[in-house]
């Protein structure tokens, strides 16, 4: 994970005190980052929740104090405005292992194989 923001520096105190944009395909519920932060007895303020990282990056350009925590391997595939800075996350977040499942009938399907390959490139 990395942090995107217009802020000029990033510390643990700044990270925890700043307003955050949360990204999730679900409308409600705890975000994966918050599960790990809560385990360390940290919390953050989610002021806005959206479903796409690209939308969150656009919002960051209009919210100078806002912060987005985003997987580094996703960020490299998105457009980043020039006024946004990238920092390492100042709190420890674990790596998250992702897996893919598909029906055995699709194993030899060339289109499905291509799609799996592209997904692996993004999330590897």
Say what each PLM segment does:
Residues 16-17, 64, 94-96:
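Residue-level preference for short coil/turn positions at secondary-structure junctions
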Residues 3, 12, 84-124:
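A late-sequence structural motif
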Residues 26-85:
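Hydrophobic hinge/microswitch elements
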Residues 4-6, 10-12, 17-40, 108-110, ...:
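Secondary-structure junction motif
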Residues 24-25, 48, 90, 104:
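Structured beta->alpha junctions
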Residues 2-4, 21, 69, 101:
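Structural motif
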């Amino acid at each position: 994970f990395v942090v995107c923001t217009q802020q000029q520096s990033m510390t643990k105190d700044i990270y925890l005190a700043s307003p955050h944009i949360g990204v999730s395909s679900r409308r409600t519920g705890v975000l994966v980052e918050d599960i790990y932060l809560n385990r360390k007895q940290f919390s953050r303020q989610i002021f806005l929740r959206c479903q796409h990282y690209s939308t969150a990056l656009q919002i960051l350009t209009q919210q100078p104090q806002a912060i987005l925590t985003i997987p580094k391997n996703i960020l490299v595939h998105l457009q980043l405005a020039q006024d946004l800075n990238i920092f390492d996350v100042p709190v420890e977040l674990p790596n998250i292992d992702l897996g893919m499942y598909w029906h055995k009938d699709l194993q030899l399907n060339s289109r499905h194989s291509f799609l799996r390959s592209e997904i692996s490139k993004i999330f590897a």
